[in-house]
């Protein structure tokens, strides 16, 4: 595995974790908050 490929995979994993964390937070907030903001 080349270093650039390893960096790409690690950045992809980090980005996926960030997106997953934001998605979970949004779901929790939307379930606990009954006021529709959209």
UniProtKB/Swiss-Prot annotation:
Function according to Swiss-Prot or TrEMBL: Involved in the binding and/or turnover of quinones at the Q(B) site of photosystem II (PSII). PSII is a light-driven water plastoquinone oxidoreductase, using light energy to abstract electrons from H(2)O, generating a proton gradient subsequently used for ATP formation.
Domain of life: Eukaryota
Compartmental location: Plastid, Chloroplast thylakoid membrane
Family: Belongs to the PsbX family. Type 1 subfamily.
Record key words, sorted: Chloroplast, Membrane, Photosynthesis, Photosystem II, Plastid, Thylakoid, Transmembrane, Transmembrane helix
Residue ranges crossing the lipid bilayer per the database entry: 9-29
Signal sequence residues: none
GO cellular component: chloroplast thylakoid membrane; photosystem II
Entry keyword annotation includes Mitochondrion: no
Protein name: Photosystem II reaction center protein X
GO biological process entries: photosynthesis
Membrane topology: Single-pass membrane protein
Subunit structure: PSII is composed of 1 copy each of membrane proteins PsbA, PsbB, PsbC, PsbD, PsbE, PsbF, PsbH, PsbI, PsbJ, PsbK, PsbL, PsbM, PsbT, PsbX, PsbY, PsbZ, Psb30/Ycf12, at least 3 peripheral proteins of the oxygen-evolving complex and a large number of cofactors. It forms dimeric complexes.
Pfam families assigned: PsbX (PF06596)
Gene3D superfamilies: Single helix bin (1.20.5.510)
Organism: Trieres chinensis (Marine centric diatom)
């Amino acid at each position: 595995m080349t270093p650039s490929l390893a960096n790409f995979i690690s950045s992809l994993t980090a980005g996926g974790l960030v997106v997953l964390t934001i998605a979970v937070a949004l779901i929790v907030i939307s379930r606990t908050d009954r006021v529709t903001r959209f």
